[in-house]
From Swiss-Prot:
Positions with biased composition (Polar residues): 7-19
GO cellular component assignments: cytosolic large ribosomal subunit
GO MF annotation, one: structural constituent of ribosome
GO process terms (BP): translation
Similarity comment text for this entry: Belongs to the bacterial ribosomal protein bL27 family.
UniProt keywords, alphabetically: Ribonucleoprotein, Ribosomal protein
Protein known as: Large ribosomal subunit protein bL27
Region (Disordered): 1-22
NCBIfam families on file: L27 (TIGR00062)
Sequence intervals crossing the membrane: none
Gene3D superfamilies: 2.40.50.100
Length: 84
């Protein structure tokens, strides 16, 4: 039996693609309804007023307005505040 795997064989040489997670719209930015605010795994940020959460924990805007980051009961939340 060979103790080497051969000229072009290797067990390594692959990597997974990046998941492109993170905050997509920052505090103070004006957004329209449906825009993605945060891509995340788990609820690092929780949805506040005017923000929805998708099945993969993505936060998105339900209303148009300005993005606001804050805390509520010790949790980081993302809100949409109407622009006058």
């Amino acid at each position: 039996m060979a103790h080497k795997k051969g000229a072009s064989s290797t067990r390594n040489g692959r990597d997974s693609n990046a998941q492109r997670l993170g905050v997509k719209r920052f505090g103070g930015q004006v957004v329209n309804a449906g825009e993605i605010l945060v891509r995340q795994r788990g609820t690092h940020f929780h949805p506040g007023s005017g923000v929805g959460r998708g099945k993969d924990d993505t936060l998105f805007a339900l209303d148009a307005g300005a993005v606001e980051f804050g805390t509520h009961r010790g949790r980081k939340v993302v809100n949409i505040v109407p622009v006058a």
